[in-house]
């Protein structure tokens, strides 16, 4: 591996997630985390939104690339993960840039009062289409992104399930297929799917 090495705190977070948390594979991991950090450094956003904190790995990666006066709002529905993530945020030199929220992103995000320069979507896969509608202001709600905003949606290939026949009761895969079609057919954005890890959909608002 010729990529930059993983920071010690992130390595510990990865290890503790695997030791203590159910479904540790949901963690972004070193390569995807470094990609997120570099994208933040290159794009220089002021306001970042993350939907789906999990144990905080990706939030810390993005915060590392964020300017000192930048803010990262991260939303997690599982309150049992709150203190686990917060304990690592407190130990990071970038933790002061992170604002943690517990609850439904569909309820919390519209109350934050920002338009976002960068959004990382990694929450409930069944809600990806609703997250997108919320961000784009569909249905008459306030638009939460602007021209030039970047949206990054994780797990977009869903272990290859999106190219296989979908069971009628597989709501996760159905929602991801709907999301991918929404992006492809929406003339307000342009996108590319990057087959890193479980797939990233990189979306730019025109």
Language model: regions and residue ranges:
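S-adenosylmethionine/decaboxylated-SAM
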Residues: 30-206
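Class I SAM-dependent transferase core
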Residues: 1-49
């Amino acid at each position: 591996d010729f990529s930059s090495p993983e920071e010690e705190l992130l390595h510990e977070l990865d290890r503790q997630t695997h030791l203590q948390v159910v479904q540790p594979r949901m963690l972004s991991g070193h390569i995807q985390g470094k990609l997120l950090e570099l994208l933040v450094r290159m794009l220089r956003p002021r306001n970042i939104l993350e939907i789906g904190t999990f144990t905080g790995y990706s939030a810390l990666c993005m915060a590392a690339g964020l300017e000192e006066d930048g803010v990262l709002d991260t939303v997690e529905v599982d309150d049992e993960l709150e203190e686990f993530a917060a304990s690592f945020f407190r130990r990071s030199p970038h933790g002061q840039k992170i604002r943690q929220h517990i609850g439904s992103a569909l309820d919390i995000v519209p109350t934050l009062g920002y338009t976002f320069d960068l959004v990382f979507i990694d929450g409930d896969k069944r809600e990806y289409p609703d997250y997108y509608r919320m961000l784009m202001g569909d249905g008459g709600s306030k638009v939460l992104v602007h021209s030039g905003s970047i949206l990054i949606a994780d797990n977009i290939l869903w272990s290859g399930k999106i190219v296989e026949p979908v069971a009628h009761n597989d709501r996760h895969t159905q929602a991801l297929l709907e999301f991918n079609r929404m992006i492809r057919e929406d003339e307000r954005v342009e996108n590319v799917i990057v087959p890193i890890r479980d797939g990233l959909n990189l979306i730019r608002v025109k």
